[in-house]
Amino acid sequence: MTAKLIDGLALSKTLRADVAARAAALTARGHQPGLAVVLVGDNPASEVYVRNKVKACHDNGLGSSFDRYPADLPEAELLARIDELNRDPRIHGILVQLPLPPHIDSHKVIEAIAPEKDVDGFHVANAGALMTGQPLFRPCTPYGVMKMLAAYEIPLQGANAVVIGRSNIVGKPMALLLLEAGATVTICHSKTRDLAAHTRNADVVVAATGLRNILTADMVKPGAAVIDVGMNRDEAGKLCGDVDFAGVKEVAGYITPVPGGVGPMTITMLLVNTIEAAEREAAANA
């Protein structure tokens, strides 16, 4: 059996068409959605991500601002800029690209963003709302994964789901969204004793560790859905995920490729969150 590919690019295209239509409707009423992107330093991967986010805004009718600062920017100056963006009525979403330089406290920066503009869903108020099942924003990558599972009609109610990774950005919110959908969820991580014992019983596996080949064919239940959130490079410098794709695709029922799987969905859900923020603001001021 060869797994069916979950095509993040195709699904992303469909969702972005909806985003563009909603953006056009808001703009026609004088409420163009706006996303502010802030980059501190010159991390090459961050530069690529930011460029893709700004381009996605332009391509789909959202306004965007891009602030780029040197790596030695004082924390106080970054916080002052966030305060300005919080008060700017043209901006509905604020994204500070992580990681930040070591002298800047990323928790302090995230908490400085107004919760209603925190389109990444990282603010403690939004994390708490997600925990209680009433999220204002769902974090973009887990939100994208849920959209993929829904689009391919992969059943979650009563399913055994394993999330490998416990980060605040992917692992923890991913587990909460799967739980909300009715799955029985296990979170595994670097201290998990026997990872394969958990994954072999899983109907759905989400790998989000940043470690190549953490999931191999012998660790996967036949027919399972395998979602690869990882972004790594192999020996030849080629982009790859956390999953041994060549092996696992012969066992799994569904699998996401890297690239072309989860990656495009992350930026798409950022656009969706920004649109939702703009729609809320427009409704409040109607």
Curated annotation (Swiss-Prot):
<keyword id="KW-0028">Amino-acid biosynthesis</keyword>
<comment type="function">
    <text>Catalyzes the oxidation of 5,10-methylenetetrahydrofolate to 5,10-methenyltetrahydrofolate and then the hydrolysis of 5,10-methenyltetrahydrofolate to 10-formyltetrahydrofolate.</text>
</comment>
<keyword id="KW-0368">Histidine biosynthesis</keyword>
<dbReference type="GO" id="GO:0000105">
    <property type="term" value="P:L-histidine biosynthetic process"/>
</dbReference>
<dbReference type="GO" id="GO:0009086">
    <property type="term" value="P:methionine biosynthetic process"/>
</dbReference>
<keyword id="KW-0511">Multifunctional enzyme</keyword>
<dbReference type="InterPro" id="IPR036291">
    <property type="entry name" value="NAD(P)-bd_dom_sf"/>
</dbReference>
<dbReference type="InterPro" id="IPR000672">
    <property type="entry name" value="THF_DH/CycHdrlase"/>
</dbReference>
<keyword id="KW-0560">Oxidoreductase</keyword>
<protein>
    <recommendedName>
        <fullName>Bifunctional protein FolD</fullName>
        <ecNumber>1.5.1.5</ecNumber>
        <ecNumber>3.5.4.9</ecNumber>
    </recommendedName>
</protein>
<keyword id="KW-0486">Methionine biosynthesis</keyword>
<keyword id="KW-0658">Purine biosynthesis</keyword>
<dbReference type="GO" id="GO:0004477">
    <property type="term" value="F:methenyltetrahydrofolate cyclohydrolase activity"/>
</dbReference>
<comment type="similarity">
    <text>Belongs to the tetrahydrofolate dehydrogenase/cyclohydrolase family.</text>
</comment>
<dbReference type="InterPro" id="IPR020631">
    <property type="entry name" value="THF_DH/CycHdrlase_NAD-bd_dom"/>
</dbReference>
<dbReference type="GO" id="GO:0004488">
    <property type="term" value="F:methylenetetrahydrofolate dehydrogenase (NADP+) activity"/>
</dbReference>
<comment type="subunit">
    <text>Homodimer.</text>
</comment>
<keyword id="KW-0378">Hydrolase</keyword>
<dbReference type="GO" id="GO:0006164">
    <property type="term" value="P:purine nucleotide biosynthetic process"/>
</dbReference>
<dbReference type="GO" id="GO:0005829">
    <property type="term" value="C:cytosol"/>
</dbReference>
<feature type="binding site">
    <location>
        <begin position="165"/>
        <end position="167"/>
    </location>
    <ligand>
        <name>NADP(+)</name>
    </ligand>
</feature>
<dbReference type="InterPro" id="IPR020867">
    <property type="entry name" value="THF_DH/CycHdrlase_CS"/>
</dbReference>
<feature type="binding site">
    <location>
        <position position="190"/>
    </location>
    <ligand>
        <name>NADP(+)</name>
    </ligand>
</feature>
<keyword id="KW-0521">NADP</keyword>
<comment type="pathway">
    <text>One-carbon metabolism; tetrahydrofolate interconversion.</text>
</comment>
<dbReference type="InterPro" id="IPR046346">
    <property type="entry name" value="Aminoacid_DH-like_N_sf"/>
</dbReference>
<dbReference type="GO" id="GO:0035999">
    <property type="term" value="P:tetrahydrofolate interconversion"/>
</dbReference>
<dbReference type="Pfam" id="PF00763">
    <property type="entry name" value="THF_DHG_CYH"/>
</dbReference>
<dbReference type="InterPro" id="IPR020630">
    <property type="entry name" value="THF_DH/CycHdrlase_cat_dom"/>
</dbReference>
<keyword id="KW-0554">One-carbon metabolism</keyword>
<dbReference type="Pfam" id="PF02882">
    <property type="entry name" value="THF_DHG_CYH_C"/>
</dbReference>
